[in-house]
Regions:
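Extended catalytic-interface subdomain
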Residues: 269, 297-299, 321, 359-361, ...
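Loop/turn elements at helix/coil->beta-strand transitions in domains of secreted/extracellular proteins
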Residues: 207-212, 228-232, 290-293, 314-318, ...
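Mobile cap/lid helix-loop segments that gate and shape the active-site cleft of serine hydrolases
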Residues: 321-379, 400-408, 414-421
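Cellulosome-associated attachment modules in secreted, modular CAZymes
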Residues: 2-108
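Alpha/beta-hydrolase-fold serine-hydrolase catalytic core, especially in secreted/extracellular enzymes
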Residues: 108-196, 201-207, 384-388, 393-484
Length: 484
């Protein structure tokens, strides 16, 4: 037998196992694939606290394999294709009886990216609940559990056609903490890069602290965030992927590791960098940050990055893009429509000439945004069911004020379909400078932080603008909100 009570840690695990035994007997739905028992990491054909302990050791890097002979497949309880903190969270929920069975999703079908030539124009905002590829192409998901597969498809399409493909976790990621800063070191194929993130700690609350990650900086009211007992982490995004202008493509520490010819826009390199930061936080308890309670925010171009980071990493509990403009919370189709109506708004055709935020693969959609098999309402939906608060300023037409409203409305419909409408908010208030964050929006931000980072009951139901915008549903959607 693998487990011997040789130390206190194993003894505690045993006691927890005993305490959960009644709960486990009441939960027989541990699904098997041939001889595979999902969640059974030590090969004893049971799922218990010992398996939870093994999962923790694996995520902390203390072990690289599981002793049960089932490999890592049994640990991938959300069927996402990777083992991460989400799997550990589901395993905990199963042991506590808050979910009925494992795995929590359906096996993911390999996603075949369609060719540009095969894409069919669609002037409306695509249905976030309809599969676009594979054997289920043209069919809608019929249960919440299928969102895992649909989410993976949206993510793959967005990376292939817009952002660039985010590489998997580097071969080695380490973290070290000193002088209120965590240094992250990533190694791949004999190359290494490092970057440091400053941490500002609150004077209230208890360690390990929840934290808001600021992309390059934090343009919200940081003093109010600290008062809530939430730490602030500054992520040096421009070090990872430069974006001074279009000529910055291929520059930054990401490209030092993967090569300057890697077709990635700056935003996806930032998402990769925050992935590595979270990996480092998970293995560096000296940093006194709770890696399960992380938010991300950024203003303007950094807001585009914040949305991409939250969309592509499910470990982010709360995403707050602020006045992010087109390529952020403003969609490509809706921006084109606003431009066609005579307003001076940034569009896809313009943005690809301004900077290197996106991969070169996006260029082929210039003048043909209707061929995109997704749009940014679906990018926002990738955050579901996690928290998303869209902070906007209607005074800046260039940022796609109406476009953002339309895109956010469609994204909220996706949240409604998934049964969590209050997990996404939209707040658009003018009368101030770009990314100045007026005091009138602070209660909304506070509510979202309280709910998603502090675990408190807060009213997060907000969808408002101080402009009289209306959503032309007949123009933008030809799909309905599902009921699961």
């Amino acid at each position: 037998m693998y487990v011997h009570l040789k130390n206190i840690k194993r003894f505690i695990a045993f006691l927890v196992c005993i305490s959960l035994s009644i709960c486990l007997l009441a939960m027989p739905d541990v699904r098997m694939a041939s001889d595979l028992v999902y969640g059974d990491l030590n090969g004893d054909r049971e799922v218990n606290a010992i398996d939870l302990s093994l999962m923790k050791e694996y995520l902390l890097g203390k072990i690289s394999t599981f002793p049960g002979g089932q490999g890592k497949e049994a640990a991938d309880v959300d069927l996402s294709g990777s083992i991460d903190a989400i799997d550990m969270s589901y395993l905990k929920q199963f042991l506590l009886g808050t979910i009925d069975g494992l795995p929590v999703g359906e096996p993911l079908e390999p996603i075949q990216i369609p060719s540009f030539g095969s894409l069919q124009p669609n002037a409306k905002l695509p249905d976030p609940f309809m599969f676009k590829t594979g054997s289920k192409k043209g069919t809608r998901i019929t249960s919440k559990s299928q969102w895992t597969a649909r989410r993976a498809e949206i993510s793959a399409l967005a990376q292939a056609f817009e952002f660039g493909v985010k590489p998997p976790k580097p071969q080695t990621v380490t973290g070290s903490f000193n002088n209120n800063s965590i240094t992250v070191t990533c190694s791949q194929n004999g190359k290494s890069i490092s970057f440091s993130c400053a941490i500002q700690y609150p004077t209230t609350g208890t360690a390990p602290y929840p934290a808001m990650i600021g992309v390059n900086m934090n343009t919200l009211n940081t003093s109010e965030i600290l008062k809530l007992g939430v730490a602030l982490i500054t992520f040096p995004a421009d070090q990872i992927g430069k974006e001074d202008n279009a000529g910055s493509r291929g520059q930054g520490k990401f490209f030092d590791l993967y090569g300057s010819s890697y077709d990635a826009g700056a935003l996806i390199t930032w998402a990769w960098g925050v992935d590595c930061l979270i990996d480092a936080l998970e293995m560096t308890p000296a940093a006194r940050i709770d890696p399960k309670k992380l938010g991300v925010t950024g203003g303007s171009r950094n807001g585009k990055g914040a949305l991409a980071i939250g969309a592509f990493d499910e470990r982010i509990a709360l995403t707050v893009p602020q006045e992010s403009g087109n390529g952020g919370a403003s969609g490509w189709r809706t921006a084109d429509a606003q431009k066609a109506a005579g307003e001076d708004v940034q569009t896809l055709s313009q943005i690809i000439t301004e900077n290197c935020w996106f991969a070169k693969s996006l260029n082929q959609f210039s003048g043909q945004t209707n061929k995109l098999p997704y749009d940014h309402h679906e990018l926002m939906a990738l955050c579901a069911p996690r928290g998303l608060l869209v902070i906007e300023n209607p005074d800046f037409t260039w940022l796609g004020n109406l476009s953002c409203f339309n895109t956010s409305t469609a994204a909220h419909m996706a949240y409604e379909g998934l049964g969590v409408p209050d997990n996404m908010g939209y707040s658009s208030v003018g009368g101030h400078g770009h990314c100045q964050f007026p005091a009138s929006q602070q209660p909304e931000l506070t509510a979202y932080i309280q709910k998603f980072l502090l675990g408190q009951n807060s009213n997060t139901k907000v969808f408002r603008s101080d402009r009289n915008y209306t959503f032309d549903k007949a123009k933008w959607v030809d799909w309905t909100i599902p009921t699961f």
